[in-house]
Amino acid sequence: MGPPLPLLLLLLLPPPLPRALPAPASARGRQLPGRLGCLFEDGLCGSLETCVNDGVFGRCQKVPVMDTYRYEVPPGALLHLKVTLQKLSRTGFTWQDDYTQRVIAQELANLPKAYLWHGEASGPARSLQQNADNEKWFSLEREVALAKTLRRYLPYLELLSQTPTANAHSRIDHETRPAKGEDSSPENILTYVAHTSALTYPPATRAKYPDNLLRPFSRLQPDELSPKVDGDIDKQKLIAALGAYTAQRLPGENDPEPRYLVHGSARAPRPFSATALSQRWPPPPGDAKDSPSMDDDTLLQSLLKDLQQNSEVDRLGPLKEEKADSVAGAIQSDPAEGSQESHGRGAEGQPREQTDAPETMLQDHRLSEVDDPVYKEVNRLSFQLGDLLKDYGSPLLPEGPLLEKSSREEIKKSEQPEEVLSSEEETAGVEHVRSRTYSKDLFERKPNSEPQPRRLEDQFQNRAPELWEDEESLKLAAQGPPSGGLQLEVQPSEEQQGYILTGNNPLSPEKGKQLMDQVAHILRVPSSFFADIKVLGPAVTFKVSANIQNMTTADVIKAAADNKDQLEKATGLTILQSGIRPKGKLKLLPHQEEQEDSTKFILLTFLSIACILGVLLASSLAYCLRHNSHYKLKDKLSGLGADPSADATEAYQELCRQRMAIRPQDRSEGPHTSRINSVSSQFSDGPMPSPSARSSTSSWSEEPVQSNMDISTGHMILAYMEDHLKNKNRLEKEWEALCAYQAEPNSSLVAQREENAPKNRSLAVLTYDHSRILLKSQNSHGSSDYINASPIMDHDPRNPAYIATQGPLPATVADFWQMVWESGCAVIVMLTPLSENGVRQCHHYWPDEGSNLYHVYEVNLVSEHIWCQDFLVRSFYLKNLQTNETRTVTQFHFLSWYDQGVPSSTRSLLDFRRKVNKCYRGRSCPIIVHCSDGAGRSGTYVLIDMVLNKMAKGAKEIDIAATLEHLRDQRPGMVQTKEQFEFALTAVAEEVNAILKALPQ
């Protein structure tokens, strides 16, 4: 038959996680009938109920008990009950909770029952009306169980030989039974372990325990308790159980030796772990194995002498002598030695001082029990067994972090008067522990020396934090009169989980399991020691299951940190960090948070760099395309010169097809109704807001105006360009011919007059007598009609298209504005800066701000727009003070064209020309063009504009050289250098290319 069901269930039950302090009994509501668990916790049954042993947990039933039965639990159901109890315990439920009662009742409802003829029951908690005969029976049975237990377990602890003594048998005295009111000390070690499990609390008064709780001791085989089979972990559990059992023994007033370490009330105290015991009794100096005072012979002699020197041994009855022999035989390792020492003298023992009196309800029974010598000797030997466990338990304990304690509970002493606590006070959450501590050193004391008492209060100053360290493992449950006791305020703690952070992200579950297995190997614990193992990114998290070593998560973390190199070598992982965090804060570990932040930063950095590179690449591409457009035209023109029969013919045919497919209608221009227009009308085809004064804006490339150029004009332009590109010397020949050309007539007598000579800027450029602008002398401030300005006719000899004039001199500014007013001019084209290299090219003939008066003409600056670095636009109001008329005049000032030179690019000048023509569109007045002398730069601009205007109007033929001769017939010196003439040809070619691109496809 296997171990009893309560033992297996409760040994495997982990300690509960305290959710909160226990509520008073009144707060739990009315007690339900038939509650379960009364064998392990008192106070469950009502005043009219008794606890019936059902073979599992115990059930409360009303008196008289009519229906008694036991559950027959198969192995599968046993495992299921274990899992259920573990879940309830970890959640924090106790037997007092209705939820626990419902869950356990539901689990037991499916189990088979075996009905009994007589029920085994015990009264409610702390009831003094127990059956005295039943209590005496189990008192003797307890002594027999203790003898058998010592005989079995002392060899297992390697303290004595495994050979049992021949006379280690005891009989049961059915006639001698203790009185009722006996204390609740457990009969044997396994019963004690079962009753001090996490979910249960032992009852204040003993119930009649079932026989099967004692049967395992007589049925266990020697090999079942062999250290080779069970290993170090079973030794540690047994050591803790034995130590706690010896601490549970309660003395009477006249006991020769105190037999308990923690004097509790009816509730049994929390069992000390092996670690706590090793800390409670300090080990003697030197190695335990080498010390001569710790050999087995000396221990046995001391134990046997104490037993035989009892003064009342000779007066024992026959049955009690057998009981004493049974105890002596249970602790002897050698039969011969035991018989030799059984008649030696005993040591004198004096009772230690007692600070608290026994409970009133137990006084009668204890006084009667003191008279029993066997009871005295058994309890005294139990105390000596505690000292043996102190010295021999330490070598069996695991090394390393097991002795390290991370969490502490504050311990407070209570000086309240002694009184019996009510049920509400028992469940109040502050546990009162009345305790007296005694320690006897068997190995260092001298014979006939009086043992020195050691108070529990003194020991708790240094040892209490270690003894009560783990609040999650076992909870102290003893309550009694508070006089001289201790108050332990058990504070609920948030569930903690340990984590080990590695350099692998993500960490595979297999690697995480391997890492925890290696940690378990270092701690010498099984893999099941760790629960809830999870992998979160690069970290593995875990919880420490309930264990007899009282090992906490902090101990495991310290062990992992101390053995970091060993773990890395065994698993191949890089351990970055280990620690403890609340369960809810494990989602983002420090390394994960840092890694996520760095990842975001790196990602944003790369995106920014990519955007910057994209913008730079697009800008470079656009620049290259625009820069190469000029060279594409030159390449095309060069290709036309190299092979005129191919590209030229194809371009001409394409132009013909386009013009035949789409022939735009001639646009009719509305009549010019007024010479006075607003500034806004000059810069756009439609109304637009007038620009603010002296503002600047960027320029835009004006698209060429839609041309009326037909197929014949296209043929003429292509043929002319083809001829110039094919014949390299044609340009030079044409320029030589132009230089030799003499205009007829070319008389300049008026300009050469003495009164007019100061009005000429250059003697090389004088107006022809037949082609000059005549001012109204009556309006002139000098009563003169002369000004160095020439009208340039195009196709209508009556209306000049341009007026080419020199830059005004300080003496001719009034004449210049008079010419502007009398000619009705609205557009002025200025092609020179005011000065070049310190040489004055033109006088500043307009106001910088406000207005200036020149004779009878008031000029008011309205606005000044800087369109680009090459030119700007100014707008003026011109008022005739004699007539009070006002007109608007716009000046286009080109800044980057110097004397005897050409602009840096044709593109800027062509854009400038388009801007001028856009403002001039729809007007019939001439355009005033001037530079410094009014011939070189002014002639080049007029030549380009005149040729392009003819092409746009659909001229049937075009000859640039002939056009220049036509200009020189009207003003001398037009286009002064060969470079200016070549620049005019290039500008015309580029504008033709732009017109061809603008034609509808």
Curated annotation (Swiss-Prot):
What residue range is the signal peptide?
A: 1-27
Supply one GO BP term. Answer: insulin secretion involved in cellular response to glucose stimulus
- Tell me where the sequence motif Leucine-based sorting signal sits in this chain: 990-996
The EC number(s) given in the record are: 3.1.3.-, 3.1.3.48
Which cysteines in this chain are paired by disulphide bridges? Answer: none
Residues spanning the membrane: 601-621
Q: How is it modified after translation?
A: Subject to proteolytic cleavage at multiple sites during maturation of secretory granules. In the brain at least IA-2beta71, IA-2beta64 and IA-2beta60 have been detected, in the pancreas and a pancreatic beta cell line only IA-2beta60 has been detected.
Q: Where is the composition biased (Low complexity)?
A: 394-404, 691-705
Mutant phenotype after disruption: Mice appear healthy and normal, but display mildly decreased glucose tolerance and impaired glucose-stimulated insulin secretion. Pancreatic islets from mice lacking both Ptprn and Ptprn2 contain decreased numbers of insulin-containing vesicles and show a further decrease in insulin secretion after glucose stimuli. Mice lacking both Ptprn and Ptprn2 appear normal, but have lower levels of the neurotransmitters norepinephrine, dopamine and serotonin in the brain.
This enzyme catalyses: O-phospho-L-tyrosyl-[protein] + H2O = L-tyrosyl-[protein] + phosphate
Where, by residue number, does substrate bind?
D899, C931, S932, D933, G934, A935, G936, R937, Q976
Q: In which tissues is it expressed?
A: Detected in brain. Detected in pancreas islets (at protein level). Detected in pancreas and brain.
Residues with an annotated glycan are N550
Q: Which InterPro entries match?
A: IA-2/IA-2_beta (IPR033522), Prot-tyrosine_phosphatase-like (IPR029021), PTP_cat (IPR000242), Receptor_IA-2_dom (IPR021613), Receptor_IA-2_ectodomain_sf (IPR038112), Tyr_Pase_AS (IPR016130), Tyr_Pase_cat (IPR003595), Tyr_Pase_dom (IPR000387)
Keyword Amino-acid biosynthesis listed: no
Expression triggers: By GHRL in brain, pancreas, and insulinoma cell lines.
Which residue intervals define the domain Tyrosine-protein phosphatase in the entry?
731-991
The Gene Ontology CC terms held by the record are: receptor complex; secretory granule; secretory granule membrane; synaptic vesicle membrane
Q: Where in the cell is it found?
A: Cytoplasmic vesicle, Secretory vesicle membrane; Cytoplasmic vesicle, Secretory vesicle, Synaptic vesicle membrane
Residue intervals annotated with topology Cytoplasmic: 622-1001
Give start-end positions of Basic and acidic residues composition bias. 312-325, 340-355, 405-416, 429-459
Q: Which residues lie on this side of the membrane: Extracellular?
A: 28-600
Instruction: Cite the record's note on assembly.
Output: Self-associates. Interacts (via cytoplasmic domain) with PTPRN (via cytoplasmic domain). Interacts (precursor form) with CPE. Interacts with HAP1 isoform A. Interacts with AP2A1 or AP2A2 and AP1G1; indicative for an association with adaptor protein complex 2 (AP-2) and adaptor protein complex 1 (AP-1). Interacts with AP2M1; indicative for an association with adaptor protein complex 2 (AP-2). Interacts with MYO5A.
Let me see what the UniProt entry remarks about domains. The tyrosine-based internalization signal is proposed to function in clathrin-mediated endocytosis and recycling. The leucine-based sorting signal is proposed to function in trafficking at the plasma membrane.
User: Per its UniProt record, what PANTHER family does this chain match?
Assistant: IA-2 PROTEIN TYROSINE PHOSPHATASE, ISOFORM C, RECEPTOR-TYPE TYROSINE-PROTEIN PHOSPHATASE N2
Name-wise, this protein is: Receptor-type tyrosine-protein phosphatase N2
State the species of origin.
Mus musculus
